[in-house]
Regions:
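Active-site cores that bind ATP or allylic diphosphates and position pyrophosphate for catalysis
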Residues: 1-379
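Small-molecule kinase domains that catalyze NTP-dependent phosphoryl transfer to phosphate-bearing small molecules
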Residues: 322, 489-545, 553-557
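Hydrophobic anchor at the beta1->P-loop junction of P-loop NTPases
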Residues: 387
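P-loop (Walker A) phosphate-binding loop of NTP-binding proteins
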Residues: 390
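ATP-binding Walker
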Residues: 393
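Walker A/P-loop
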Residues: 396
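Conserved substrate/cofactor phosphate-moiety recognition/catalytic segment
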Residues: 400-449, 453
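ATP-dependent NMP and nucleoside kinases share a basic, alpha-helical "lid"
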Residues: 425-431, 448-508, 514
């Protein structure tokens, strides 16, 4: 804590500085830098440290550090504000709350593909960490000395949030000398309880349940629901053995490197051990059903460095329920003639969405009740239908007709965000440059996410020619509900023949520049939820295709 006098001086000084509003990820990172959770880091990495971390998993001082913690900005921030080496800037939250000053020592443009290959072992943007790096992270990194001013504010669960020094003090008060950390980004069920408690008892230690409440994988269950589940599962551990503390970490889903990173962080929080299980911090499977990392690759990497970083690993294989024994066992220990039971995260979500039974052997009834309250069935969740296609493809006509049709039997509020309507009321000052088109789609995505978050249906029908902005919307909206991308794939020749607004003719004559499909590209979706070519079908038939898809997938009933 700094004095009120010094805080006032900092605020007055900040009025004369350029400000950078931090993203959610950057806020997570700076909070953990300032608290000491990212020790030995004192600030965002400079260029030399960045290169050393990417290539060698070490800082230039020689200390192990596997994940680059960088502050990314766009080129316009540098050029518009005359940013150069030695410039001091103010770092703020979205509401303007002053966090820190940064005196810049490094400005560089990284090779993000090289970074992706080194950190994630992949450049496939189906991987959420790779996608964030290549499609969302800005093109310029800046590093330098931080002047800490105020930690980011949290209004939720203040009694469950601890800095490393606070948590170490708690351990001392309770007389805990050996502490096993259990990392999770999902609700805990019976198998997780068995793994965590067995890990602690094996090494005669106490247990810290240390879930991530910063950014996790897109589509994960929100942290409010998860924390309520963690609080309930605490009752199933013997009294005095287990503690819950929340970690405001922004995960990268980097598998082996992330496991090593998690070990370093938990060491800083005073833990002596960490549980590392199957595919720790992995993002799941790629679009072809293949894993990005070996099942125990994370364990192997942490084991290699555990002595050096000062934390021991408690490794666990996958746990399954054995019906004949009525208990959980490591999968490799189950005799072949016995039945192994398990429910994946995907299957659990399917059961919740469709009101199917969730057996007692899998989880506790109070956890199921909590999940059901926060995870209604599909037909009661918020939904965004995002149409994309060339001008004249039929997307606006289908979207309008679909809105009217759905209102016949839908209880959820339905909002149409048509491209022309949005341009008139939400983006009237924007032109048609790539930057402005992306901004227009981002605005549509934000409005749709708010509609979806509140249980409504948003029907969006812009051209949305660029894959990157569509993907950003998908990620944003998927945090709050369901996202359906509908590609109206009517070919250019058909759209140009229709040309109801005469725009194609003007584009061919050079009267309109940067017209999608003529002299500006349309990037077709690679894997849309639904694809419709309206060349040889009526509007009613196209609308019916969408209705049937929504019924089949359980989004409407």
């Amino acid at each position: 804590m700094i004095s009120d006098t010094l805080l006032k001086e900092f605020k007055e000084e900040s009025a004369g500085l350029k400000s950078l509003v931090l993203t959610d990820r950057q806020l997570c990172d700076i909070e953990l830098i300032m608290s000491g959770a990212f020790a030995p880091l004192k600030g965002f990495l400079g260029k030399d440290d960045y290169n050393s971390v990417v290539n060698n998993m070490r800082l230039i001082s020689g200390e192990v550090w596997p994940i680059p913690i960088t502050l990314d900005v766009d080129e316009n921030f540098i050029s518009d504000n005359s940013i150069e080496i030695g410039t001091k800037i103010a770092l703020r939250e979205k509401e303007g709350f002053l966090i820190a000053f940064l005196t810049i020592s490094d400005i560089w443009s990284p090779d993000k593909e090289v970074e992706a290959e080194a950190i994630f072992k992949s450049t496939n943007t189906h991987h959420p960490g790779v996608n964030n790096l290549l499609n969302i992270t800005k093109s310029v990194y800046i590093g330098g000395e931080l002047t800490y001013i105020q930690q980011p504010k949290h209004y939720d669960y203040p009694l469950l949030r601890h800095t490393p020094s606070e948590l170490k003090s708690q351990f001392d008060k309770m007389g805990w000398e050996k502490i096993v950390a259990f990392q999770t980004r999902n609700p805990m069920h019976r198998a997780h309880k068995e793994i965590a408690y067995k890990a602690a008892t094996e090494v005669e230690a106490n247990l810290l349940i240390h879930p991530v409440v910063g950014q996790t994988k897109p589509g994960d269950i929100d942290h409010f629901t998860r924390v309520r589940c963690y609080q309930k599962i605490l009752n199933h551990f013997p009294e005095g053995t287990t503690m819950l503390s929340l970690l405001p970490l922004s995960m990268r889903m980097a598998g082996p490197r992330e496991a090593l990173w998690h070990g370093l962080i938990r060491k800083n929080y005073g833990c002596t051990h960490i549980v590392i299980g199957r595919d720790h911090a992995g993002p799941g499977k790629d679009e072809n059903g293949n894993d990005y990392y070996g099942p125990y690759e994370a364990q192997d990497l942490l084991k290699k460095y555990s002595d050096e970083i000062g934390i021991e690993m408690v490794e666990f294989k996958m746990m399954v329920y054995v019906e004949e024994k009525a208990e959980y066992m490591p999968i490799e220990s189950v005799p072949k003639d016995l039945k192994k039971l398990n429910i994946s995260g995907t299957e659990l979500r399917h059961r919740l969405e469709n009101h199917l039974d969730i057996p007692d052997w899998f989880t506790y009834p109070e956890i199921v009740d909590e999940l059901k309250m926060s995870y209604p069935s599909k037909e009661n969740q918020g939904l965004t239908l995002f149409f994309t296609g060339l001008s004249g493809s039929g997307k606006s006509t289908i979207a309008n007709g679909l809105m009217v049709k759905l209102k016949e039997y839908e209880k959820r509020a339905i909002t149409l965000l048509d491209g022309d309507i949005v341009r008139t009321h939400l983006s009237s000052e924007l032109g048609f440059s790539k930057e402005h088109r992306d901004l227009n789609i981002t605005r549509i995505g934000f409005v749709a996410s708010e509609i979806t978050k509140n249980g409504g249906i948003a029907i969006c029908a812009p051209i949305a020619p660029y894959e990157k902005s569509r993907e950003m919307n998908r990620q944003l909206i998927s945090n709050y509900g369901n996202y359906i991308e509908i590609y109206i794939s009517t070919p250019l020749a058909t759209c140009e023949r229709r040309d109801t607004k005469g725009l194609y003719a003007m584009a061919r004559q050079g009267k309109i520049k940067g017209f999608t499909g003529i002299d500006d590209p349309y990037e077709a979706p690679k894997s849309p939820s639904l694809e419709i070519d309206t060349t040889d079908i009526t509007e009613e038939e196209a609308i019916q295709k969408v209705i049937l898809f929504l019924e089949k997938e359980g989004y409407i009933s």
